[in-house]
From Swiss-Prot:
Residues 226-260 form a coiled coil. Residues 165-236 form the bHLH domain. PANTHER family: TRANSCRIPTION FACTOR HMS1-RELATED. It comes from Aspergillus fumigatus (strain ATCC MYA-4609 / CBS 101355 / FGSC A1100 / Af293). The lineage of its organism: Eukaryota, Fungi, Dikarya, Ascomycota, Pezizomycotina. This is Transcription regulator srbA precursor. Keywords: Coiled coil, Endoplasmic reticulum, Membrane, Nucleus, Transcription, Transcription regulation, Transmembrane, Transmembrane helix. One of its GO terms (biological process) is SREBP signaling pathway.
Amino acid sequence: MSTPGIGGDFQLFSPLESTRRISQGNSLSVDQSSTDVASQDWTQWMRWDDEQAFPETANASPSSPFDLAFISPSASSGREASDAMHKDFSPDISLDFKSPSLGFFPGGDLNTNVSPQPDHVGAGSLSVHSNSPLSSIGASRKRKTGSDDDGSTMTSMFKAKQAPSKKRAHNVIEKRYRANLNEKIAELRDSVPSLRASYKQANGNSGDDDDDGVTSASKLNKASILSKATEYIRHLEIRNKRLEEENTALKIRLRQLDKAADQIVTSAASVSSPSDCTVSTESGASSSPSVFSHAEDVPSDHSPTSSHPPEGLIKVPDAWKRMRAAGSNESPYSQSYIQYKKTDSHSSQSGGGRMRSHLPNKYMLGALAGLMVLEGLGTEKKTESTAKGLLAVPLNLLNRVQLPSEVYSSAAFQYFWSSWHARAISHFLMLAILVVGSAFIVFVYLFNSDPRRQYSASKVAPDVTLSSCNFRRQAWLTSIQRVGVPRHRFFHEWYVVTSRCFEYVLRCLLGWKLYSLVTGVTEEDEKGRVKTWDIAIDAQLAGGDAEISKSRLVLTIFAAGTLPRSPMRMMLKALHCRILMWRVGEPGSWTFNVSNDVARSLARYQWDLARKMNAALPKDHPDSLPSHLATLLKIDCDDVMIDTIIQRAANLTWNRPTQEGTDDDEALLDVVEEDPAIQSSLDALAAWWSSHLLQGALLRYFEASSGGPDAKKSRNVFKSKIKLALDVAPQPSAAHTRALVMMAVFFERDRVANIGSVLAALPKEKGKNKQNQASNFLDSSLPISVREEISTAVRCAMIAAIFNARATGDTSLPATFTVEKAIHWFNRLPLDPVELTLLEFAAVYHLLHILASDIDYLASSDSSAPPSPMSKASDMLSSSSDDGEDGASQRNNNIIPHPMPNLGRVASELIYWARNAYNPAFYGFTSNLVKVIETECTSLCQTAGVHVADYSCVQEEKSKAKQAIDSKRRFAGGNEEASDNLLLSDES
């Protein structure tokens, strides 16, 4: 702020200039478009309380240049006098100027209102600062009335005492205040497009401005102007927000396009020559290749903004210009980077094209890298140059090395070659090359060997979502992430197998303590590694490895060698050896026999070692085996790992159906694969061997039932095998339940307890509560395929228990278990020739022996010999053709009207199954065994006074009637299809 005083900052006004200012002030007004003048006028109008040098009369014409500011900007002569005002109005008068001297006004009318000034503040010494803002005192002062408007504050500015001025009239103040508001509202009206358009239409001008979506105002009053201004502000806020969102989205998209362009530049560098991607530093218009580099240049808009960018900003790259120019034609922004699945043919072609394009790129990059290395290995240039190569090895120092003479070198070489050191080194190198080469050849065979190619009929087993195989695969995939098993790639697997082999050899030579000291493996790391490898090896042998190969089996068996020894790991390693060396070469060849012999020897060694370790461990030791595996370990390895079981174990490991490659004569072993109670590969081995032992025991029982000289010995062997099969089978698997139900059928001791255990393993009946049914079904570990046969066998055991309790006088059974009920169950046993299994056949066959041997019961009955069924044969045939299966039950009631066990029907059903059904071939039945069964059934019925031949005729007639019914049904179905075809042809 300028301070009063006499100096160079003050300017004096001549009377001529003052007269010219007064004469021009009557006809001038402030232009609306001049923002500077308007701001000055606004400042003067809002400071009317500080101006003391004006007359009180409001309507008087201005006599000084200070009255010019009170003219309304909307006056009619405002625009016409704007130029004159800008030319003649002196900008040297400060807005803070309040009290001019008396000599400043030529008229002298204001002498009574202004007190005389001192000499040093006269007309000759008065100065005004050009374009100075308001003083801090005047700007911060509030509006005052009455005696407060005495102008006493101006004394500090001019340092002179002024006389108090006369008060201004109130209407003048209000008029100027309203003029100020009207002017600002007029500016606000001109700032809103809709109001500006309405104003121009009212004045007769055409509205050329864009209203930006805002409707024009109907009446230009202050309220409408303010409301429209508020509406326009909200409209601008919404549009600004939308523009910000679009700007953000475009920035994100531009960033994505830059990333895509960088990726394409990186990928294109492998197929293009280095000169294509080289950017010249001399040309400023060149740019790096981008995703839009292939597009043609489209002429850009020749607007001033695009052709002449603002000065001082970073120049837009040409790649971005081409990208923006090509956007309207090729629409690159509309294409999504998310690639959806295409058709198989197109995807296969594109995949093959990508593979073909990658291989030359790799070769080209390798060749370029080789050239660069050779260029770096070149000799040093003779010319002096400041260029530096990429090779950091100081090869130029080799030129300074002085080589010995050729005579000395040849003599030293001959001396070294004749020494024993050279012979030892050469022998070691030859042996190493031989071993490594042999190992490499063996690994090539192991990597490419796949037993799936050896089988003619190969059907992939169906993948069940909730099967145990899926859980094993998840366990395998989880464990290999830590132990570092690579994918099925040649060099990766070769490296890992070789490293595991050296690790195994080094650990065997050094021992765990020295090995851990050398490698730095801690005890906690070793525990985690051991646990992970245990899970991985067991999951692989149980079929969890989907990419299994013999090289991976070698990898896991070497890893198993690095684990601490325990009985279970030794048993698993024995099975691992048999699976790894199973079927090496064609069956019957020398490689096949030698590999099996070597595998048996290794497995036998591991098995015996596990047996010794388990015998030395206490019962509560963490490494002690479960009861079923401990029982299995007591048996010889060659007796457990027979060819049939090893074939099924290999099929399980290689993800094949377990019955593939077998002789199809041991159907009891097929259920192990679908049994959810089998938790590991050793459990599967125990279940297979238990089922194999149970099947052999049942076949031995059929042979011993004929009553030969060795019958008693065979029965004892049979009972011991049944008990051993029960002890070996893992609980609660299907093999264990089968052995348990056979114990309940054949053994009188603890029969009721065994029946209760079998019933607990079976799901409840459908008539029970749904909640109990669902829980029992989920908790039951029995597969669905074995539930029917176990139910029939346990029913036979219950019938045998009832008859045994009647013979011995035992009253421990419930009162509802009567002999009549047992006979009713026996007569209604389901003996379907197609669905009957070996387990059901053995249970019914033994029950037939129990009932036929009860002579006292047959003698005490009303009729020991039932009537012949031949008299009812014709009625049965007629009823079978009409009523079907309902008539079959009626025929049985006609044959045996008395509550007697229908021994003839059961015996004839068993004989028919042994003769004609195809199921016995799956269980190892021979022709001699079939003859033994026929003879035994016939003799049992003859002892009871029943002729099996009559029932056999009925059985044959029944089978013929069933065949006739089936043929009639097929014929009726064919007629219906023919009639349907005729109807369709008629309609067409």
